[in-house]
A protein has these predicted regions:
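Short gly/ser-rich loop at a beta-strand->alpha-helix junction or flexible surface loop bordering the NTP-binding
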Residues: 2-9, 15-146, 153, 157-235
């Protein structure tokens, strides 16, 4: 394949990955180490943004650049559009940052995987927990846990309850997630807060009261209706 064709193919891949490419993808296209050095030299086509991840200089800089690069590192052979939750889902504080929920700083890149995986990066944290399909969505091209799952994950990590309360209200207000879904995800944590075991409604009320949002009563009505529907469907 001619060099011009190779570069064109790389640009096509990068277009679907926010202007980013992994070293593995570059090598699979037929570009060796020497050619890659030329491409990343001053005035070249690429710049290195993380170990084994490069950005096409002419492409717009994407939001959450470092998070996207860290996610690509998890499965460097696979293009973004072929990945599933098995290759890692953005979660915890990182997921909250993608939605712009709450105020917890995303000082590490956090991902949830079903199987253990090692990373040498100190700023990357891998959580090994089961993740159901309904607990994550595609957001801005990334697989990201839903806010109801984020809240539950943060509670498992013993995050500040006030921070979780703010995140919940921030998510329900623009309908990023639903009161009933939060009631479901909070249920396993109720006993730790002195409430009846499995009472996700009571814990949701506790968090919403803490947030002070004026829509609390309406949201609780929605959550109760959801819980009632679920109960009828399972009896």
């Amino acid at each position: 394949m001619q060099r011009s064709s190779v570069l064109r193919r790389l640009q096509e891949v990068a277009q679907e990955q926010w202007g980013l490419l992994t070293r593995r993808q570059i090598e699979k296209a037929g570009i060796g180490s020497t050619s890659l050095e030329r491409l990343t030299a001053e005035g070249g086509l690429l710049e290195r943004v993380a170990n084994g991840v490069y950005r096409v200089i002419a492409a717009p800089i994407p939001d959450h650049l470092n998070l996207r690069a860290a996610w690509l590192q998890l499965a460097p052979d696979l293009p973004a559009w072929e990945r599933t939750a098995d290759q890692g889902v953005v979660s915890h504080r990182s997921a909250a940052a993608v939605y712009a929920l709450g105020h917890l700083p995303a000082d590490r890149h956090e991902f949830t995987l079903a199987k253990r995986r090692q990373t040498r990066r100190r700023d990357v944290r891998i959580h090994v927990r089961p993740l159901q399909d309904r607990e994550w969505i595609g957001l801005r091209g990334l697989p990201v846990t839903r806010p109801s799952r984020i809240a539950s994950d943060l509670l498992w990590d013993h995050e500040d309850p006030e921070a979780v309360a703010r995140l919940i209200a921030d998510a329900i207000r623009p309908v990023y997630d639903y009161p009933g879904t939060f009631a479901d995800s909070l249920a396993p944590h109720a006993a730790r807060f002195g409430l009846r075991k499995g009472d996700g409604l009571a814990l949701l009320r506790w968090f919403l009261d803490m947030s002070g949002d004026p829509e609390t009563d309406r949201w609780m009505d929605e959550a109760r209706a959801h819980v009632d529907r679920t109960a009828r469907a399972t009896t």
